[in-house]
């Protein structure tokens, strides 16, 4: 009773605050049961709303169903509502079930019932589950409906903005970069320590970025230090528990959905044109006391080329029909230096980057079952296109998942699941994380992108390397298999036996070809003779076995006990090697034998 009185007092304070500000609390999706009699006097319904302990409910919403006519109860739980005879009256309040009664003859005395549904919701917390009402730690729960409709590339991004205190950030723009996850802000400054939470997928440690977001049934985020009582030193920064979907009793259900997306750069830049750039550089040199960098003759050529109409690579035509070129040759054989003689007008950000990148995703799943057997299977394909213009950059992902559950006997249940993920990543071999900022320093607008023959001009322009130097690829396969046994020989005594095997194979291939300039006649000239092929291999095998038993019982219908004990063992084996061969002999066979 003391607990009930405390709850009533807190609700009364909430209702007083609502009445003081003149704001009516919104009706809630709750039901109530009571005895009701209605007095109809001149179209006015009067009555009182009480809680299960008989205390008045302050601020309960009372309204005529299907209309905007409504009121709230006063400090004594009383109300007066304009309603016609026979009108249906709804009474609702947060934390209680809603009642709908028909206006009759007599006072309306309503006794609400507690809505225990929210408190009975089961949450995955560590080994096993708990009801929300019994939780003492900080836990946030997300269900599949909140995740499925989000157009994201991975499950980590799907959680962004859904969990208070969960911070998700990216430290790199590379397409194979994975987001960083942090639960409680910056928690460590130690070198090599990221302070990331422990991530468990169906009870086994895994990578959140490798699963299909639409395979997720629910996510529980354990935020406080209480998680360390179960997971020890691996969980000081929180735990993210992911439960994937499984089959349900009922007829077979087939789902398919897709999405097509166009992405733009968040802060795409554009360079000033060649005329403005040359003027600014001259002003800077003059202010520094070193005179102008672009003399008058070159300035005139820059202005003329800027005002002319493009008609071909490195070529424009002025109003008089004269052809102008972004770079010339002084000796008739090789092109002049771009910094010293170039008069082109190139926006390097526009030349190297697309304005939009295309992505597409396809999802298909099938599920069904009965009381004895259920199944779930899914397939996902995700293509993420990059922003590079001169060569392909992409990151593709393939996901397949299957899960079956079988009630073998009355006391034995078996679950088996398998999940396979492949990611294919590709980018130009000379693409670096600093390219975008390097363009601001090295990408002068007067530097030519191409000569008049259509060949890419040499460095310091990055175009030649991006278009012709080779590619960097990475292929990653992850296979995850789990077997779960649930043994319940007597009621409320359950024993869980789980085994997980995960294998990962990653192969990276990086080749660097020789770079060729071209002379005025279009003949190739070796610019960079450095060439090599690099191969990396990474293999990982992970084994996890855990067994725990739990027993629930109650005394005097008031004292609930949950006893649990268990054991866990895991093993991780890694193999990693890399090699590189310099001096490519045959560019048609870029491989290491």
Regions found by a protein language model. Name each.
Residues 50, 463-464, 487:
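Short, Lys/Arg-rich amphipathic segments at extreme N-termini
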Residues 244-246, 368-370, 406-407, 485-487, ...:
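Residue-level signature of outer-membrane beta-barrel architecture
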Residues 492:
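Active-site and adjacent substrate-binding regions of carbohydrate-active enzymes
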Residues 147, 151, 175, 354, ...:
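Catalytic cores of large soluble enzymes that bind and process phosphate-bearing ligands
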Residues 77, 363-364, 482-484, 503, ...:
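Short secondary-structure capping/turn segments at boundaries of alpha-helices and beta-strands
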Residues 249-344, 382, 386-480, 496-498, ...:
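Surface-exposed loop/interface segments of Gram-negative outer-membrane beta-barrel transport/assembly proteins
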Residues 1-401, 413-415:
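Short, small/polar-rich motifs associated with maturation and membrane association
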């Amino acid at each position: 009773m003391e607990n009930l009185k405390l709850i009533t007092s807190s609700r009364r304070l909430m209702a007083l605050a609502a009445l003081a500000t003149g704001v009516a609390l919104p009706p809630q999706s709750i039901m109530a049961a009571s005895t009701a009699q209605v007095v109809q006097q001149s179209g006015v319904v009067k009555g009182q709303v009480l809680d299960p302990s008989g205390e008045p409910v302050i601020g309960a919403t009372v309204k005529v169903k299907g209309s905007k006519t409504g009121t709230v109860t006063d400090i004594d739980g009383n109300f007066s509502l304009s309603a016609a005879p026979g009108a249906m009256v709804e009474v609702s309040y947060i934390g209680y079930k809603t009642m709908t009664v028909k206006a009759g003859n007599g006072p309306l005395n309503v006794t609400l019932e507690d809505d225990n549904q929210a408190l009975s919701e089961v949450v995955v917390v560590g080994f096993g589950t708990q009801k929300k009402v019994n939780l003492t730690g900080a836990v946030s729960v997300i269900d599949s409906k909140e995740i499925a409709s989000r157009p994201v590339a991975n499950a980590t991004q799907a959680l962004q903005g859904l969990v208070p205190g969960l911070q998700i950030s990216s430290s790199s723009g590379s397409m194979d970069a994975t987001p960083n996850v942090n639960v409680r802000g910056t928690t460590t400054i130690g070198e090599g320590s990221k302070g990331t939470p422990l991530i468990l997928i169906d009870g086994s440690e895994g990578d959140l970025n490798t699963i299909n977001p639409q395979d997720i049934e629910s996510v529980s985020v354990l935020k406080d230090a209480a998680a360390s009582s179960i997971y020890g030193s691996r969980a000081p920064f929180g735990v993210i528990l992911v439960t994937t979907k499984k089959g349900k009793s009922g007829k077979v259900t087939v789902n398919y959905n897709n999405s097509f997306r166009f992405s733009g750069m968040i802060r795409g830049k554009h360079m000033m044109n060649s005329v403005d750039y040359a003027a600014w550089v001259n002003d800077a040199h003059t202010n520094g006391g070193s005179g102008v960098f672009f003399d008058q003759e070159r300035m005139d050529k820059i202005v003329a080329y800027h005002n002319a109409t493009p008609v071909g690579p490195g070529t424009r035509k002025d109003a008089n029909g004269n052809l102008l070129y972004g770079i010339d040759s002084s000796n008739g054989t090789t092109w002049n230096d771009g910094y010293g003689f170039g008069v082109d007008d190139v926006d390097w950000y526009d030349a190297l980057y697309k304005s939009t990148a295309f992505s597409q995703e396809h999802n298909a799943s099938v599920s069904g079952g009965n009381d004895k057997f259920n199944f779930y299977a899914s397939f996902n394909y995700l293509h993420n296109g990059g922003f590079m213009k001169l060569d392909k950059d992409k990151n593709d992902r393939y996901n397949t998942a299957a899960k079956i559950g079988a009630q073998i006997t009355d006391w034995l249940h078996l679950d088996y699941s398998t999940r396979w993920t492949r990611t294919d990543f590709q980018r130009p071999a000379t693409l670096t994380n600093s390219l975008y900022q390097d363009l601001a320093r090295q990408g002068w607008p007067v530097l030519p992108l191409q000569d008049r023959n259509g060949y890419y001009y040499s460095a310091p322009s990055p175009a030649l390397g991006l278009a012709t130097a080779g590619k960097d690829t990475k292929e990653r396969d992850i296979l995850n298999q789990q077997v779960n046994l649930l043994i319940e020989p007597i009621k409320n005594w359950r024993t869980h036996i789980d085994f997980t095997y995960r294998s990962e194979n990653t192969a990276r291939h990086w080749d660097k070809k020789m770079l060729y300039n071209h002379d005025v006649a279009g003949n190739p000239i070796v610019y960079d003779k450095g060439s090599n092929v690099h191969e990396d291999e990474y293999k990982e095998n992970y084994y996890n076995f855990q067994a725990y038993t739990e027993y629930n019982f109650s005394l005097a219908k008031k004292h609930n006990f949950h006893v649990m004990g268990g054991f866990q063992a895991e093993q991780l084996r890694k193999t990693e090697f890399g090699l590189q061969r310099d001096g490519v002999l045959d560019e048609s066979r870029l491989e290491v034998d």
